[in-house]
Amino acid sequence: MKNRKSGDAGMKYDPAQVRIHEAYTVAIRDLGVHGEGIGSVDGFTIFVPGALPGETVTAEITLLKKSYAVGELLSIEWESPFRVVPKCPVYENCGGCQLSHLTYEGQLDMKYRRVKDVIERIAGESGDLVKPVLPAAHPFAYRNKMAVPAGLVKGEAALGCYRQGSHDIIPVSSCAIQKEENNRLLQFARRFIEKYGISVYDEKTRKGSLRHVMGRVGDDGKVMVVLVTASETLPEEKRWIEGIQKELPEVISLWHNIQPKPGNTILGAKIRHLWGRETLTASLCGLQFEVSPYSFFQVHKEQAEILYEKALAYADLQGGETVIDAYCGTGTISLCLAKKAKRVIGIEIVKSAIEDAKKNAKKNHMENTEFYAADAGKLMPQLYRQGLVPDVIVMDPVRAGCSEEVLKATAGMNPKRIVYVSCNPATFARDAKILKSEGYEIKEIQPVDMFPQTMHVETVALMIRGKSK
C-alpha cells in the first residue's frame, strides 16, 4: 500500500498536497449523481466509488483535478449498517446499477433526500413538499426490456453489459434486475453464439455482425426477440428461428433489425419480421397496448401504474375537463386521463410515437382523444388562439426538462392545475421555479422508485394556479 494519510488525525492538507497514488482516510458524507461516495480531506473533495455515507474508508487517489479527486476504495475502516453484499457478481464493474451495495431502505432514503435537496436548493421551496418515496414491491427482476450488447472480449465473442463509463463488454449470464424470461433469452443466445461461431460486431474496427440481443416481456410472460446486426443478413438465421422455437417456448415474436451506423442508437431504420406475431400485448392501468420493436413502453409496469395513478389523482378530473398532455409519447398517460376527462389532447414531436398513440386510442375505444405530431411549444399557443382553454396541463418531458416555449405556453394558457411528471428532479426543480414566477405554486411532490438498484428516481408533482394569477 502507498503511504497512508489520515484526514481525521488533525492534519491540515493544502489541496495541492493531495497527491496522485497516495492513500488517504476519507469520511464519506453523501452520494454523488452516479452513486459514488463523496468525502473530503480538510475541505478538498474526494469521490470514492463504492463507498457509502457514514463510512470511513481508505482510498488511493487515481485522478487528481484542481477542485476534486477520485479515489479507489482500498478498505472500509468504519462500515455503514446499510451496506449489503450485492446480488450481482459483476456489480462493481457494470454500469447498469449503482446502489446494489445499499439496503433498499437506504436507497429509498437516499432518493428522498436527493429530491428534497434540489427542491430546496434549485426551486427555492420547502423540502416539506416532498412526500416519502413510494417503494417498489419487487426491487429485483422488474425490467421487462433487455438490450444486451455483443462484442469481443480478448478476441472471443461475448454477450454482456458495458463496463461503467465505457463500451467494453463484461460477459454476463444473467442480470439481477431483469425478468427471468429475459435472462433465459440471454443464456440461450450465449450458447448459440458459442455453438455456431456467430460473428459479433467490433466497435473499434466496425467489422462483424451481431450487435445486440433485445428481449421484451409482455404481461403474460410472452416474449418478443429482436436480433440486431450491422450486416444486412442474419448469420444462421434458420438456426436462430429453430433454436428459439425449441428452447424458448415463451417467445412468440422474432425480428431482425439492421443497424449499420456506429454510435449508441440500438435499433436501425430497417427491420424484418422473421417469425410469429408482430406485436406484444401489454396492459397499463386497465388499458391495452400493442408493443412493437420500436414502441416505447414502461420497463417497470407495476411502478408506472403507481406513478400514473398519482398523476391522475393530482389532475382531480370530474368528467368535464379539457386536458393537454404535452410530451405525450405513445399516449399512455393521455389514455389514463381520457377515462375521466371530457377531452384530452396529446402532443409529441416524434411522429412514430403519435402513430402508436392513435393506434392505442383506437384499441381502447378512447374517442375523446386527439393526438398531434408537433412541437408542443409551438402548437399550444395556436390551440389557445383557436379558443382551446385547458383545465389541466400534464407534462412528462425527457431528462432535459421542458423547453422554455412549453413553459411559456403553459403559463399563457392559464390552467387551474399543472401535473408535472419528471425523470430528473433537478430539471423539474428548475422548471418549477420558472412556473412559480408565472403565478403557480407547488402543492405536493411525490417521488416514485421506478428503477430500484439505480440512482434514478421519478417524481410527479402538482402545481396550482395562485390566487393572484
Q: What spans do the regions from the language model cover?
A:
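Terminal RNA-binding accessory module
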Residues: 1-90, 370, 378
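Short, acidic/hydrophobic/Gly-rich beta-strand patch recurrent on exposed beta strands
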Residues: 37-42, 160-163, 228, 357
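Short, aliphatic-rich beta-strand segments
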Residues: 215, 221-230, 288-292
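Extended interfacial segments that mediate partner engagement and assembly in macromolecular machines
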Residues: 74-86, 92-200, 234
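Short, conserved phosphate/pyrophosphate- and ester-handling motifs at nucleotide-, phospho-/glycolipid
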Residues: 54, 178, 300
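Short, solvent-exposed loop/turn elements at beta->coil junctions and helix N-caps
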Residues: 131-139, 203-204, 210-212, 447-450
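A short, glycine/Asx- and small/polar-enriched loop/turn
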Residues: 140-144, 219-221, 455-456
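Rossmann-like S-adenosyl-L-methionine
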Residues: 2-25, 33, 232-469
